Amino acid sequence: MPPTKPVTEVLLKHKEHQSAQEFAATLEKIAQKLRAEGQFTFVQGTEQVIVAPSDQVKVSYEYTKKGDKHSFEIEFDWYEGARAQGKMGIE
């Protein structure tokens, strides 16, 4: 019997229109919280979703264009407990 795949659980899904300045402020707030606390919290009404990445993340960037619609995506994934691997140096 093949191993079962883990079930995908959607913890947050939200879309809204923002100005480019509002979006930039959101990205800056996420970056500030990650640097200071190692996590950030999305608040939607009374619900809160804490996003706490591991030390090591995989980052993907994608920019696409279809007709006059442009899409730029930033995605980062991690495994719980993943630590940054030591970097090799030469002396």
Which residues are covered by each model-predicted region?
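Long protein-protein interaction modules used by eukaryotic assembly/scaffold proteins
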Residues: 2-10, 48-60, 64-91
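Short non-domain terminal segments
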Residues: 21, 38-40, 70, 74
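Short, contiguous, helix-prone interaction/anchoring segments in small proteins
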Residues: 23-55
